[in-house]
């Protein structure tokens, strides 16, 4: 074999072994960010159950009730898709991707901040409307996020609130990640 052939085969083998190490390193590289929707509907055992963290309770209702409303509102954004938003810790859930829904986060709260903290931020009730910040995160980095407001007078049973969450999720996953190439 010629020296050139040996070099080409060696480089090909090195490249193949680097890919075999796992795509986690590639996906975590700050330049490469895949489409958020691809992550949301990725296949695998229980991989479509997305851990969802809820910050704040603007209506002062039972946390389980708020969790059910948020989960079902988000799921209604994806009719016909096998994806669920798990608001309670369950075994077998993915830990690389998660959703954060923050009600009345501080003005300084950003998608980056709520993704890094996995929703462990305070909630501050201010004004006549409820600021809602939603982010879909990959390993603590937001792939996509969206912010909106709803009148404080509406409650979780109010159709306006349910439609707001559903429409936010639809718009968010239609958007392309700013880091996507």
Describe each PLM feature range:
Residues 19-76:
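A structural "domain/chain start" motif
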């Amino acid at each position: 074999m010629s020296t050139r052939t040996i070099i080409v085969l060696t480089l090909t083998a090195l490249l193949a072994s680097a890919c075999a190490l796992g795509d986690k390193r590639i996906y975590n590289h700050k330049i490469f960010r895949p489409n958020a929707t691809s992550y949301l509907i990725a296949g695998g055992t229980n991989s479509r159950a997305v851990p969802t963290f809820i910050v704040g309770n603007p209506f002062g209702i039972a946390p389980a009730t708020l969790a059910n409303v948020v989960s079902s509102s988000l799921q209604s954004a994806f009719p016909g898709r096998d994806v669920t938003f798990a608001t309670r810790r369950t075994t077998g859930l993915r830990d690389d991707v998660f959703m954060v829904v923050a009600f009345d986060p501080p003005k300084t709260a950003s998608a980056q901040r709520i993704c890094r903290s996995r929703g462990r931020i305070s909630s501050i009730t201010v004004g006549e409307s409820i600021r809602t910040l939603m982010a879909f995160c990959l390993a603590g980095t937001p792939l996509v996020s969206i912010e909106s407001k709803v009148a404080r007078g509406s409650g979780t049973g109010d159709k306006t609130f349910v439609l707001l969450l559903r429409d936010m999720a639809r718009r968010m996953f239609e958007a392309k990640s700013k880091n996507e190439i």
